[in-house]
Amino acid sequence: MAADTGSWCVYAVLRFFYSLFFPGLMICGVLCVYLVIGLWVIRWHLQRKKKSVSTSKNGKEQTVVAFFHPYCNAGGGGERVLWCALRALQKKYPEAVYVVYTGDINVSGQQILDGAFRRFNIKLAHPVQFVFLRKRYLVEDSRYPHFTLLGQSLGSILLGWEALMQRVPDVYIDSMGYAFTLPLFKYVGGCRVGSYVHYPTISTDMLSVVKNQNPGFNNAAFISRNALLSKAKLIYYYLFAFVYGLVGSCSDIVMVNSSWTLNHILSLWKVGHCTNIVYPPCDVQTFLDIPLHEKKVTPGHLLVSIGQFRPEKNHALQIKAFAKLLNEKAAELGHSLKLVLIGGCRNKDDEFRVNQLRSLSENLGVQENVEFKINISFDELKNYLSEATIGLHTMWNEHFGIGVVECMAAGTVILAHNSGGPKLDIVIPHEGQITGFLAESEEGYADSMAHILSLSAEERLQIRKNARASISRFSDQEFEVAFLCSMEKLLT
């Protein structure tokens, strides 16, 4: 009797849900229809708005080209790509209107342009219109202590919506890695869209870190120690990677900055027919003016690091390896050594990280030998590189590494991380000759630094000559040719 009652209850529940299936399906269908109609109405409204503010020159309507770059005043390698891209486009298409969506609301457009000139020595020939976005906080990583990738990606859609509501372009370029804005501008804004990808939001390497339960800056120790949490995070990553691939595939053209990035984007976005490597522009000519002889104003050796103070740059590894070098090798080398960390601070989070690094150097007892140079001018940067013996880079799987190229062009002996762009594209043999060194661990960096410093001046000079000869492929001129070739599809 109890079994019959139980069977009847299960049957009743199933019948109840079955009775809801078709009404639910109809409701979902109606909602989808309303959503499509709503998006169509919004698109129609935006197109009318675009026509009402469009301008013409010599009787021809001007094309509006917009770059989505919320941190355009940050002063990093990604910003150099932005300004060089604008300079190249203005040369070839001077009649177009150029717009930059930025969240740098505390400065004026002219101050942003002046900063680009000071840091990168880049001056644009024609005006640029800046659209200032007030909701940039939606893409700050500090806002999402958990589910950071998802939070920032959803936040970028809202930030993109703010941008689209202020100015509707004809051509939209995501130059900072906010791929979730692409379908918004393509299907709602009616734009032709493209991407310049510095670093995939998620990569197969990140999946491997979680799968193997390895701790890292994007995989907290409490998760890596727990098999259940690791499994849950892996599922989250796989789902996110699937959606990331869908939004990325909306691009009409895709430019990537290295072989490493290309491999990951092809795996995730599956748009090989419109994807090309466009190496980022590195100001090699300016640095090539630095003499190669070892000019020494003070005795000893200077070790220089270039890179924004972000967690993935792993400046802590540089300080730890340098402390190890001083503690274990300095007596053998007999030199006065100094480490100078040069980089840009975008916000309070970056400033907090700098203070943490200062504390680390104090705890390791090397504070007298470590200096921090924040948001310095281009001339100051060039001066430090002219005095440096070693250029340091410690980011795991750096997408490319403009700082690495700049160090090589300036004549430092580069010591970079044995992964990503530096390993695959930059610190590679030139005509069979060594162009620099690679390392991974604290001990490996300390040993490599000691080895470089133990070389004779003539041996270091030969390595520096090899490095300089190998980097012509990363010049501004090469970037302009490749970038304009890719952009032609969107502008013709």
Swiss-Prot record:
Pathway: Protein modification; protein glycosylation. Signal peptide: none annotated. Residues 1-19 are lumenal. Keywords: Endoplasmic reticulum, Glycosyltransferase, Membrane, Transferase, Transmembrane, Transmembrane helix. GO terms for molecular function: GDP-Man:Man3GlcNAc2-PP-Dol alpha-1,2-mannosyltransferase activity. Belongs to the glycosyltransferase group 1 family. Glycosyltransferase 4 subfamily. This is GDP-Man:Man(3)GlcNAc(2)-PP-Dol alpha-1,2-mannosyltransferase. It comes from Mus musculus (Mouse). The lineage of its organism: Eukaryota, Metazoa, Chordata, Craniata, Vertebrata.
